[in-house]
Amino acid sequence: MTKYIIITGGVLSSVGKGTVAASIGLLLKNRGYKITMVKVDPYLNVDAGTMNPYMHGEVFVTDDGAETDLDLGHYERFVGINMYSYNNITAGKVYFEVIKNERQGKYLGQTVQIIPHVTDQIKSMIRYASNMANADITIVEIGGTVGDIEGLPFLEAVRQLKLEEEEGNVVFVHVALVEFLKVTEEIKTKPLQHSVQELRRIGIQPDIIVARSVVPLDEETKKKIALFTNVKPEYIFSNYDVNMTYEVPLILEKQGLASKILSKLNLPDNQPNLSEWIRFIDNLKTADKEVKIALVGKYTKLKDSYISIKEAIYHAAAKLHIKPVLVWIESTDIENSKEAIDKLKSVDGIIVLPGFGSRGVEGKILAIKYARENNVPFLGICYGMQLAVVEFARNVLGLEKAHTTEVDPNTPHPVITLLDEQKKVVQIGGTMRLGSQKVIVKEGTLAYRIYGNIEVYERHRHRYEVNPEYVDLLQKGGLVISGVSENGLVEMIELKNHKFFLGLQGHPEYKSRPLAPSPVFIGFLRAAAGV
């Protein structure tokens, strides 16, 4: 029978629930338990696909093509398991199913209400995700903060879940901020106390508290929290500041969090093997050979917009034992500022990041031109690959007004155009070419040397493609088409006689993990570092 760990959050959002949930998953998986994860997002969007990255951060794409919350990326990277569409439950999905059921007469004439119909649907979706994974333990992270009006049905649903499950099958872990005042050097616990009081009003008593803090909690602070939250001090843990999020599982393991959770769930506490994880962190900490990488994009003011790419760089860097220095460059700045262009002169490699729309496009093209002309290792991902084709068409083939029809529908040289299957699509959400797609790699190319296989799979998220009508012209001009889909779509492009120049329509960052880095990022960093 599946056991459940419910993660709630208090005081404020972005308090680290996702990292704590992923860390618990890692620690329990390393003890031999089969784990699955569920992220509950109380927003009314059906998925994260139509959200602005500045509002919500990266959209993480799963193998089955779901456009999900970035926390699912944390889960995959930490726990080392694949997530699917059913691992991300949103209020939009829940209400959509409830209304559909009502229209189909499945409620037999009942008045459809939040309780029981919405809460039953939430529980059903949690249990479905658990059953699909045949999990020993399902970790459910409730997005948002206790007290948010949109989160109330979800908290009520997990309260009911505990009531319905056998004793010892459900554990509540509450993650909340405790503020450290530098002026008085005091830790203030009152906001955490109030968040637990709010949780208890809903009918949920946390079994374990993880306090997010700048510094480790002392015993007196734990006793104070215990007094006001009805949680014993030995079940209060400190998630304090560390140099990198990958250290969080280790500090929680050192405090005994996983062991306490297992005791609450009446499960054996096996000895974990974290040696590979520790080695990965040590490699990052002890690396001293610096390599400067420019990341050129339109959402660089919020680094979470590209979190999987950032993490994929660190995964590959640990493998190569080098120290990456990330130089974030807003692509619009390159269009308007000589200083931004000058930044490119100091880097060892350039990544042109994915994105949509016209803003910052010319800046990205200038960055690609610089990389091509100056033999700087270049990696273009999704839109970055498409714009590399545009740059090549303009500046090598002499098609001065070449463009993507996404930006200029009337371009005389539409080297990038809408996929055939997208031309009749009206709805925006969930309609792109999504998920894991097979790529056939040409032997003797850079891509083949990187992957070492003729057939590879990468996750995709796009509507546009390299225009098939221009493929012959591009190849005659010197562009290498090193990877295609099963039906002939251009998937990978590269240049001969260049240190490293590779563009991919897919997103290799989504499959990169600390202990299994993406070969694309390994190849790129190896070229940038000269190792």
From Swiss-Prot:
Pathway: Pyrimidine metabolism; CTP biosynthesis via de novo pathway; CTP from UDP: step 2/2. UTP binds at residues 13, 188-193, 224. The active site is at residues 382, 507, 509. InterPro entries: Class_I_gatase-like (IPR029062), CTP_synthase (IPR004468), CTP_synthase_N (IPR017456), GATASE (IPR017926), GATase1_CTP_Synthase (IPR033828), P-loop_NTPase (IPR027417). The keyword ATP-binding applies. Residues 1-267 are annotated as: Amidoligase domain. ATP binds at residues 14-19, 71. Coiled coil: none annotated. Mg(2+) binds at residues 71, 141. GO terms for molecular function: ATP binding; CTP synthase activity; glutaminase activity; identical protein binding; metal ion binding. PROSITE patterns: GATASE_TYPE_1. Residues 292-531 form the Glutamine amidotransferase type-1 domain. It comes from the Archaea. L-glutamine binds at residues 54, 355, 383-386, 406, 463. Allosterically activated by GTP, when glutamine is the substrate; GTP has no effect on the reaction when ammonia is the substrate. The allosteric effector GTP functions by stabilizing the protein conformation that binds the tetrahedral intermediate(s) formed during glutamine hydrolysis. Inhibited by the product CTP, via allosteric rather than competitive inhibition. The keyword Nucleotide-binding applies. Keywords: ATP-binding, Glutamine amidotransferase, Ligase, Magnesium, Metal-binding, Nucleotide-binding, Pyrimidine biosynthesis. Pfam families: CTP_synth_N, GATase. CTPSs have evolved a hybrid strategy for distinguishing between UTP and CTP. The overlapping regions of the product feedback inhibitory and substrate sites recognize a common feature in both compounds, the triphosphate moiety. To differentiate isosteric substrate and product pyrimidine rings, an additional pocket far from the expected kinase/ligase catalytic site, specifically recognizes the cytosine and ribose portions of the product inhibitor. Belongs to the CTP synthase family. HAMAP family: PyrG. This is CTP synthase. The lineage of its organism: Archaea, Thermoproteota, Thermoprotei, Sulfolobales, Sulfolobaceae.
